[in-house]
């Protein structure tokens, strides 16, 4: 299971990078409109913050302190910086998973998750679904608000 999670998170982060790179401009990354309050840039920051918190700080002991509200308020971060942060998140996830023994997945996650004591496997699997949900939103955002007709093949 650990190898599967590692591979799926690596693929997801690579797809996130491809999506960010597929935006025609930095301004397009931060575009919102109508009933779409979150830009792709903010969703990317949210995913990065999520991984840094749940993998880096909680499993890896990195000391990362999450500011979730800021993930949705920050704006106009450069495309280059987002890509750098995506690559850093890849390392954070890889390092955190590397610290886990396969048996650790069955143990209770170090902090409560959604006000419950659940296994580490449950949390990491849940977070993968959360990641993919927002990745799909980013793809849809790019095509809807920016006018791209095709998927980024991410």
Segments from the language model and where they lie:
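N-terminal leader/capping segments at the start of a protein or of a new domain
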Residues: 2-15, 19, 23
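Short, contiguous alpha-helical
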Residues: 6-10, 27-70, 111-154
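Acidic/histidine-rich alpha-helical segments that form the ligand environment
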Residues: 74-110, 119-131
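Surface-exposed helix-capping loop/turn segments at secondary-structure junctions
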Residues: 22-29, 97-106, 143-148
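Residues on one face of amphipathic alpha-helical coiled coils
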Residues: 15, 92-95, 133, 140
């Amino acid at each position: 299971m650990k190898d599967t999670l590692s591979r799926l998170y690596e693929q997801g982060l690579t797809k996130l990078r491809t999506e960010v790179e597929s935006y025609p401009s930095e301004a397009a990354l931060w575009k919102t409109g109508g009933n779409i309050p979150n830009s792709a840039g903010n969703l990317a920051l949210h995913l990065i913050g999520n991984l840094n918190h749940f993998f880096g700080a909680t499993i890896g002991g990195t000391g990362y302190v999450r500011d979730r509200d800021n993930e949705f308020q920050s704006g106009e971060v450069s495309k280059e910086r987002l890509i750098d942060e995506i690559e850093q998140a890849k390392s954070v996830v890889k390092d955190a998973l590397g610290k886990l023994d396969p048996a650790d997945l069955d143990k209770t996650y170090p902090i409560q998750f959604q006000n419950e004591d659940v296994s580490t496997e449950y949390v990491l699997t849940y977070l993968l679904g959360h990641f993919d949900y927002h990745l799909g939103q980013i793809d849809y955002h790019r095509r809807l608000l920016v006018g791209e007709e095709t998927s980024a093949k991410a």
